Amino acid sequence: MMLPSPVTSTPFSVKDILNLEQQRHFHGAHLQAELEQHFHSAPCMLATAEGTQFSDAGEEDEEEEGEKLSYLNSLAAAEGHGDSGLCPQSYVHTVLRDACSGPKEQEEEVVSERSQKSCQLKKSLEAAGDCKTSEDGERPKPRSRRKPRVLFSQAQVFELERRFKQQRYLSAPEREHLASSLKLTSTQVKIWFQNRRYKCKRQRQDKSLELGTHAPPPPPRRVAVPVLVRDGKPCVTPSAQTYGSPYGVGAGAYSYNSFPAYGYGNSAAAAAAAAAAAAAAAAYSGSYGCAYPTGGGGGGGGTASAATTAMQPACSATGGGSFVNVSNLGGFGSGGGAQPLHQGAAAGSACTQGTLQGIRAW
């Protein structure tokens, strides 16, 4: 049986609603308020009733009222409700309270019966809940049974692995044929291939991660970049600049600037340059012959234009008969006359053999 707790809680809890003592105090206060209202109205009603009785009955009624008052005084003294100095009006109130207490007691009995029923219902619910929890604790929920795992034999696994190496994906007829040969179902073969493909994928990922973490990074590529400009000045001249080709031959190998520039001054450098040019021209052999005449010009007072005109060689092709004018490769001597490049001992003139290739026209 539940004991009422003296601690007051929120008015919305179940304990406050089902607490019998608080309900009784509440009903008692409510009844006292109603009785006080009746007590305030009772003296007036009693006075009017007594006035009518006194007017109607006369002296006999007065004697009866006196007997009633004496009876009330003796009843009050016997019960001991108050002091001996209380007025008769208070005893009237007690009598009226006793008269009115009948229906109120019935209401209290109904309320108490309802509260007892609610308490019994609550106890029964709690007991049922405790029984359920105990039953649940004793009897655990049955787990959903998993399908038994398919165990493949070594021969089946070997055959599946061999077929997987040959073909990672199987069509429906191929799957059916393989399953029938291995005494398996088509679904089992399909699931095995799916798991095997996923396993291969995971292995590749793990391997790539291991290589990425443990292996050193590859060295950076080095590309040769030619320096074209340094401090605002070109580093490679156009004549000496070489261009890459698939055969490894630069463009400078076919340069036509192999002959130095020639001047018309009276210096030893000009003579040395002329000798070098003659030696280079003699190195080439061809079908063209150049005859340089030995005609001399005037004295020291001759002009350069006259000497140039006198020193124009007459070159004739041995076979064709066409004439080609080639620039003079000789210099001018100190005497002012044109000096031949090559002089023979008998004829006084020499013909050099050369080709047009490698000789730059003047």
UniProtKB/Swiss-Prot annotation:
It is found in: Nucleus. Residues 132-141 have a biased composition (Basic and acidic residues). InterPro entries: HD, HD_metazoa, Homeobox_CS, Homeobox_NK-like, Homeodomain-like_sf. SUPFAM superfamilies: Homeodomain-like (SSF46689). GO terms for biological process: B cell differentiation; CD4-positive, alpha-beta T cell differentiation; cell fate specification; digestive tract development; gene expression; gland morphogenesis; immune response; leukocyte homeostasis. It holds the Pfam family Homeodomain. One of its GO terms (cellular component) is nucleus. Residues 145-204 bind DNA. It comes from the Eukaryota. Expressed in spleen and intestine. Also expressed in salivary gland and tongue. Residues 126-149, 203-222 are annotated as: Disordered. Keywords: Developmental protein, DNA-binding, Homeobox, Nucleus, Transcription, Transcription regulation. GO terms for molecular function: DNA-binding transcription factor activity, RNA polymerase II-specific; sequence-specific double-stranded DNA binding. Belongs to the NK-2 homeobox family. Transcriptional regulator essential for normal development and functions of the small intestine and spleen. Activates directly MADCAM1 expression. Required for homing of lymphocytes in spleen and mucosa-associated lymphoid tissue. May have a role during pharyngeal organogenesis. This is Homeobox protein Nkx-2.3. It comes from Mus musculus (Mouse).
